[in-house]
Curated annotation (Swiss-Prot):
Keywords: Cell membrane, Lipoprotein, Membrane, Myristate, Palmitate, Phosphoprotein
Protein name in the entry: Small membrane A-kinase anchor protein
Record organism: Mus musculus
Summary of the tissues where the protein is detected: Widely expressed, with very low levels in spleen and liver.
Record keyword Membrane present: yes
InterPro entries: Small_membr_AKAP
Region of interest (PKA-RI-binding), residue spans: 62-85
Function: Binds to type I regulatory subunits of protein kinase A (PKA-RI) and may anchor/target them to the plasma membrane.
UniProt subcellular location: Cell membrane
Lipidation (S-palmitoyl cysteine): 3
Lineage: Eukaryota, Metazoa, Chordata, Craniata, Vertebrata
Amino acid sequence: MGCMKSKETFPFPTTLDIDKLHESEEAFIPDDSSQYRTPSPGEQQQVQEVKKLPEPGAVIGALILEFADRLASEIVEDALQQWACENIQYYNIPYIESEGSDTTIN
């Protein structure tokens, strides 16, 4: 008998369904869509104007670099400030060197 849910159809497409989907899509694609059309002179001028604009990636890259540099400087300042505070707090505690691992504690 089994569970009722197991008898329901699988809600996700199977590989067979995907193949059928691709076949139906190919029927709607016209053949002349792959032909190349030469742009008119007005369109060529618009393309050249677009090429003259600065690349957004370069502007964004410069902003990210500036932000990263500023953030790194803040991190270094905070670390030095924290080290200075800790150093002042514990400066009078003497440093004890260990004599090595060959000594045993009795």
